[in-house]
Amino acid sequence: MKKIILIFLILSLNSYSQYNISGVIVDNTTMIPIENCKIIDILSKAEVYTDSNGSFSFMSNNKIIVSSPGYETKEVIINRDEHLTIYLIPTINKLEEILVKAASIPIEQKHATDAVSIINKKEIDRGNTIELHPILNKVAGVFMQHATLNTNRIAIRGIGARNLFGTANIRTYFGDIPLTDGNGESSIEDIELASLSKIEIHKGPSSSTYGVGLGGTILLKPTLTNYQESRASLSTSVGSYGLRRTVANVTKGGKKSNFNILYSNNHSDGYRVNNTYDRNTVTITAGVDTDNMNTFSIIASYINLKAGIPSSLNQEDFDTNPRQAAFTWGRSQAFEDIDYGILGITWNHQYSDKYTQYTSLFGSFRNNYEPRPFNILSERSNTLGIRSRILGKHTIHTKELTWNLGGELFFDFYNGRTFDNLYQDFPPGTGSVQGNQLSDLQEKRNYYNLFAETNLKLNNKLRFNLGLHLNQTFFDVNDQFLQDGINSSGTFDFNPIFSPKIGINYVINSNLILFGNIAHGFSTPTTTETLLPEGVFNPDIKPEIGWNYETGVRYKFLKNKIYGSISLYTLRVRDLLVTRRTVEDNFFAINAGKTNHNGIEGEINYTSTKTNYGQLNFYINTSLNMYTFDEFTDLEADFSGNNLTGVPKNIMNLGIDLISEKKFYANLNFQAVGEIPVNDANTVFNDPYELLNGKIGYQNTIKKHWKCNVYIGANNILDKKHASQLQINAIGFGGNAPRYFYPGLPFNIYGGININYRL
């Protein structure tokens, strides 16, 4: 009996033993330490808060609760003395969410001085998880057109809408790796959505640290594995028009290292003729904590893509048979075949509580073989770069000062060759046939960025943000094909461009926060745009320059049940680049005008009280776009006062989310897009249209380790005929009508299942 009592006493004492623990608490999506995070010991009720580096230490009896505004509360079991890394998952309430201020100075979104939108993992997974445009188009001020899965164009506040092909004038990054090439063009639609934990969009030229593109900055945050967590998942889905998708993901997290590998396979037969799509992607992220002062992280991704190009249609073909390909593009069986890889390694060194250094080495390669009716393009590109910055924190007479200082070097080595396409010399069905060489250009497209940014907190109400950015871009073109009698060789060094910004954030009360900023931005011409028709550099070409003026308010009421923001802005752009085509594949640019981008953006979110049945969330956002040509003369035509081409006058999104206590969930999104000018003369407009998308599903945890998610969804439920992308200012060659319109998908459905196993 005495032995039994003794054993009982020992066990009782052990169950209440105190453990000396320490650690750091970080954001699960950004890996940024969380300041002022609350840790409570359940038994003793003792509590402690993390410091500015997210660190803490205290005595615990067995179990702690970790909480912070904007994050899901987490419970952690303690059974020994140890150093912990604890990850918190951001909640939907975006005003409280921690963000990386353009990946430079961590700050809560409500205290940002610019208009910034955050798309978290739950919102990324809201649709079919293969298309990016439904995700971005729910953000006020952002409009992504999508001709096919491999042909897209993103505009932010009207900037980028007049680009002929793809996305330009917007800086994009995957982690710390630039997705924007030396020509200022970006292709983010090829990145696997399942590899993303977060998308951060800064509207306007307000990101000093990551370039000051006129439109703004898009930061794609890769999914990083939690330490001491291992899991595996498999997803498969099918949909209309031969859509098939498989995603496999394995993660392994130890005490000091983590590893995440994701593979995806995507296929679509396509809605149109010559519209097949195949993409395979492998994405790897890894991290190592060598000690308390140094961490290393790796991001790598390889993409193999082959997709048909049906191209745009004229009005008659769009109205009568939108599923056809443009005749010459279908006859030549045009396609693009891309191999694309990116790699980045980041070193994080903490010198002290006040100073931290972040240094990244990155590189990429891109090979593309692209037969078109007018020629066959074969191109290779290799990039290499380095970014380094130091983050400092100080307190000066009770005033909090945080600063960021650094630079970036970027080298882009490009080779593009074109060949005759002899498809017309062969029977229909043969497709493209490579002929004689037409051109061979080797290009070096390099730049450097120097940047500085600081946040000054004068008191709990008033904050200032100051930023400086210096850029210089260099082009070097070597023409390796002189048989055509044209030598396009030459160098073109743009003058250094200095871009300042100033921002302010003022807390009126617990419900209202004012913000505003003035920022300078620019966009350089591409190498093609700098060449005149005779093949020589245009010495008079200049970058587009703009100043953005903005003010807004962020609000929350009814205990955070209602929250949102309103922004008013004007962006004045001068030296507008106007593209002129001489033949189907030959165009150049001149500086020919000014534009005014005046707009209002509003967002309202409502979260209902959680009941035994579940919870409902509502949202509405709208963009009112008053974009015009201030001064614009092209040849003999004066377009001054016309509406800016390629941008709708208004966009509205309405949505509802249901999260049931019975494990069911559902969402519905309605989007209304106003009419869009298709040419600079404003003589052709794309009709307004409405889209209704929805998804329902069931997810449940089975025996603790297994989680299953089954869903079905539909896009364009109302089956509205619409043009999902426009070829602005199209010209009809050979007496043919201009081909302005890319048909959007009619009603289509998808469904799938995801199985997740967690150790």
Where are these regions (language model features)?
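Structural signature of Gram-negative outer-membrane beta-barrels, strongest in the C-terminal barrel
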Residues: A300-S301, T398-N404, E408-F410, L441-V573, ...
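Membrane-embedded beta-barrel scaffold of Gram-negative outer-membrane proteins
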Residues: S257, T346, Q350, T356-F362, ...
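Transmembrane beta-barrel wall of Gram-negative outer-membrane proteins
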Residues: R231, V238-H267, R272-P310, F335-Q350, ...
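C-terminal beta-signal and adjacent terminal beta-strands/loops
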Residues: E675-P677, Y698-L759
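Short, acidic, small-residue-rich periplasmic hinge/interaction motif at the N-terminus
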Residues: V26, K38-I42, S67-Y71, D81-D125, ...
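Gram-negative outer-membrane beta-barrel transporters
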Residues: N460, Q472, L568-R572, I590-I676, ...
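N-terminal periplasmic accessory domains that precede
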Residues: E82-Y87, L132-I135, I154-A155, I170-Y173, ...
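Short acidic/polar hinge/loop motifs at secondary-structure boundaries
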Residues: S57, I177-K203
